[in-house]
Amino acid sequence: MAPRKRSHHGLGFLCCFGGSDIPEINLRDNHPLQFMEFSSPIPNAEELNIRFAELVDELDLTDKNREAMFALPPEKKWQIYCSKKKEQEDPNKLATSWPDYYIDRINSMAAMQSLYAFDEEETEMRNQVVEDLKTALRTQPMRFVTRFIELEGLTCLLNFLRSMDHATCESRIHTSLIGCIKALMNNSQGRAHVLAQPEAISTIAQSLRTENSKTKVAVLEILGAVCLVPGGHKKVLQAMLHYQVYAAERTRFQTLLNELDRSLGRYRDEVNLKTAIMSFINAVLNAGAGEDNLEFRLHLRYEFLMLGIQPVIDKLRQHENAILDKHLDFFEMVRNEDDLELARRFDMVHIDTKSASQMFELIHKKLKYTEAYPCLLSVLHHCLQMPYKRNGGYFQQWQLLDRILQQIVLQDERGVDPDLAPLENFNVKNIVNMLINENEVKQWRDQAEKFRKEHMELVSRLERKERECETKTLEKEEMMRTLNKMKDKLARESQELRQARGQVAELVAQLSELSTGPVSSPPPPGGPLTLSSSMTTNDLPPPPPPLPFACCPPPPPPPLPPGGPPTPPGAPPCLGMGLPLPQDPYPSSDVPLRKKRVPQPSHPLKSFNWVKLNEERVPGTVWNEIDDMQVFRILDLEDFEKMFSAYQRHQKELGSTEDIYLASRKVKELSVIDGRRAQNCIILLSKLKLSNEEIRQAILKMDEQEDLAKDMLEQLLKFIPEKSDIDLLEEHKHEIERMARADRFLYEMSRIDHYQQRLQALFFKKKFQERLAEAKPKVEAILLASRELVRSKRLRQMLEVILAIGNFMNKGQRGGAYGFRVASLNKIADTKSSIDRNISLLHYLIMILEKHFPDILNMPSELQHLPEAAKVNLAELEKEVGNLRRGLRAVEVELEYQRRQVREPSDKFVPVMSDFITVSSFSFSELEDQLNEARDKFAKALMHFGEHDSKMQPDEFFGIFDTFLQAFSEARQDLEAMRRRKEEEERRARMEAMLKEQRERERWQRQRKVLAAGSSLEEGGEFDDLVSALRSGEVFDKDLCKLKRSRKRSGSQALEVTRERAINRLNY
């Protein structure tokens, strides 16, 4: 069952809670209303309403009070206004009409209270000052309260309360100071200021430590009323915690229970104090978190019950005071209702919270078959092990356990504590989250890691398939576009061929007519031959179709080695030119070179990358005089083998037997590649995540499955095995299993025929479309921008306007111009107006265009490709096109070579690259045609603007127009901003005039009503009403009635249940 939410309908009559009934205005006595005569006559209605509205604004009234005030007749309004003005102008009150006077006096009183012993007259005067301040805070206009707050008047009062001595604490001054704070809180602005002060409520609570019952009553009324204000309940609980420390209480609220049980001897004072205490207890129990939180009410009420409040309540019944009995009834009724609610949760009629055995049985019954039951047993088991001494030395451990349980019950899901008494900064939710089973967390973590790896693998496979699909799709689309273009080109060439055949037929017919005519003189020797008359058009063979790309000649055969076979007798001389062979510059010798007996190392060594001299070139050189065999006798070959061994060893001294054993078990790796290069190669292979065989198959199949990304191919090109690397690796190919990873990779790649050329062709294929897509927009930008500049009519019209303005402005040699260089366009903005330096000639040009030639303003829409063309560097573009041309040529050469070779079954270089060359050659030829056309159009554009004699590049030429268009657009924005600023200033001026007129009209139109007549304005306020309702118990009237009705219903139901149980027992 959900906890019962408590509401305070009894507060409906209060102004601060929006009561619905407007009280009547009653006179204090039975005398008739006497009008006061004033020297000044009553002004007209409009002026009276304006003056009266100013007065009402000063009084800080509620909406209903304002309505009642404005509903008064004009004579009454004028009487109230004149009386208030007369009070403000009273010369006897000028000194005390401002808060500065009171603040200075109270500060001096606080400073001198411990220095002097004041007599009775001086004490009375000091008390009168505080009383006057209390009255001023209630009766003075709103500006007085505002000024008091601004001058830190509240801080002055709080400091006085903190520093007062015992004599002052027991005097009427203390009561009056609390009254000043209460009067300040009777104002909405003052109340907000008090609640905003962090230590204000705690300082007020400190005043409970006095023997003056009136002071205690005033403090309790303030604290009880603050409980009912939004956000005040928690501040009051914190204030009572502060008072526990301040007054050295054993438990919180101990002083209140002592005062509730103590007898003062004076009936009136005793009843007032006990009523204030009970009203405060009911407010703190049922307001704030107690409105809808059953656990909070049970928790806080249990604190009072443990202090012994129930016997005290029974004792208070003897006073037979109606208001006090109302508070006692409300306390007991709410307690009984909450106990019933708690019992319903356990399907019980009543729970004896004083019986440990009954509470344990209920908890045992509730948790017996739940997962929490082992935890209950653990709690009890560890409670048995808690330290125990007869003298109670371990009370704090049990207190800690109690407070932890209180915190668990009270703290909500957001971690908010309605009461800070149990444990501060103790977040139950965070601790519960930390107590989750670690094994379960580890299990989920392992499973999540497994799923993560599977997910990453699937994502990787999906990405490869997507790349493969995307590549195939792009190739298919490009092939279809190329096929369509080739069809169109074939149709055009067929048309041209038919036209050419028709022209040939006509020419043949003409030749036939000429041959049948008069015989002409024979042609001169060596003249052109004529076609025979029998030759017709059909006899002409058709021209061969154009090849998609030029075939390259086979590579030249390698040159013969120097010691090749001699030329056979009768063979033509070398080079086919009849020239004798050149003599060998190295003379041969008939003395054979001695055979070298080089010592063999015990294991492979690193190689020395030298270029070996041929033996036939040694005679006659210094090498013929050198004998390296003598050096071997001097060298320490064993040390040399250790230093330059091809096996990689760790630089570690093998001193102990364990080191020798571990070293012997390590696998020796053979590495002949440079260390830095090998390390970079290993890093690349780790990024590829492919085996050597997978990389090899991907290269042979031209990366069908898109395993090799473009950036990886670019990196692989940096690790092409060089000839020296291949020679070294070939020497140790019998030890391939011992090779380091980088060495083995380079060795296996070197076994692929034309590995470097294949890799370059594959990389070119992957990058071709991207490079083509980068080059085409640049070519098209130049082409389209050139066309747009030449064809733009609006640009031509604007140049006419600029030429006219320039000829009008310039005289002498600069005047009378027929045209100007295009670079002059960007100098228009440099000419500033003589009247306004913010206006340039460009701004004025736009004004002219807006007024006389508005269509020219749309000129940028005709020149949309200028920004792109201004970024194109023609030299770099032509260089890129040349690189593409050379790349295609290199692929064609490699394709011709691979066609002559015997291929492996998995080698797909020829079919893949043949299709690629077919499509890419056509696309590239189209790009070249576009580039040639763009050059022509650009040259025409230069000539069109008279710049044909200059050597402007496209980026410079188009950049001039692009810069001008940007400046043109910015100038238009500047003009638009100037217009908006001007319009905004005019609109603001109109709005200010309208607002001023509206304020004047509203000042006399506001008609309100008030709760009492003008004379009652000095008495009471909304905070006083709240305190009064709390004191009388009217705050709880609605809830009390509801509880009584609920109690009757529940009592009758309980009676019926008891009867049924008795009958069942008898039947049984």
Curated annotation (Swiss-Prot):
- One annotated GO biological process: Wnt signaling pathway
Any idea where the FH2 domain is? Answer: 595-994
SUPFAM superfamilies from the UniProt entry? ARM repeat, Formin homology 2 domain (FH2 domain)
One GO term of the cellular component aspect?
A: extracellular exosome
Q: Which residues form a coiled coil?
A: 434-516
The record gives the effect of mutating residue 335 to Q as:
In NPHS24; uncertain significance; affects the regulation of filopodia formation
What does the record say mutating residue 1028 to L does? In NPHS24; uncertain significance; affects the regulation of filopodia formation
Protein's recorded name: Disheveled-associated activator of morphogenesis 2
Q: Which organism is it from?
A: Homo sapiens
Organism phylogeny:
Eukaryota, Metazoa, Chordata, Craniata, Vertebrata
Gene expressing this chain? DAAM2
